[in-house]
UniProtKB/Swiss-Prot annotation:
GO terms for biological process: nitrogen fixation. The gene is fdxN. This is Ferredoxin-like protein in nif region. It holds the Pfam family Fer4. InterPro entries: 4Fe4S_Fe-S-bd, 4Fe4S_Fe_S_CS. It comes from the Bacteria. Iron-sulfur cluster binds at residues 9, 12, 15, 19. Gene3D superfamilies: 3.30.70.20.
Length: 116
């Protein structure tokens, strides 16, 4: 199964530097793409995983090209649904951290006042 570079690519060129076969190319418009004729998916090499995927700093910058349309459709669907249904606890974590630090500061300040 081949790999492709998606719109999530940030053009950091890390994939092209780690590709052992030089299959990562840059188009005239600056977009990166993988030459399928050169890409070996790092099979039969010292690498256990495709290096373009392993070296990519983005989550979905380099992905497998599904062999079947519906396989790709459902993979994308499941990925999007997982993101949408995942509990967004950023603000809850922020508030807990903030309130803990604030409580520590109040206790420290009260200790200084009572200690004087």
């Amino acid at each position: 199964m081949a790999y492709t570079i998606t719109s999530q690519c940030i053009s950091c060129k890390l994939c092209s530097s780690v590709c052992p076969t030089g299959a990562i190319k840059v188009a005239e418009d600056g977009q990166h793409w993988i030459d399928q004729a050169l890409c070996t998916n790092c099979v039969d090499s010292v690498h256990t995983v495709p290096q373009c995927k392993a070296g990519c700093p983005t989550c979905d910058g380099c992905v497998k090209v599904p062999s079947d349309y519906w396989e790709g459709w459902f993979a994308n669907y499941n990925r999007v649904i997982a993101k949408l249904t995942k509990k967004q606890d950023y603000w809850e974590r922020w508030f807990n951290c903030y309130s803990q630090k604030f409580s520590e500061q109040i206790q420290k300040h009260q200790g200084e006042i009572l200690g004087v």
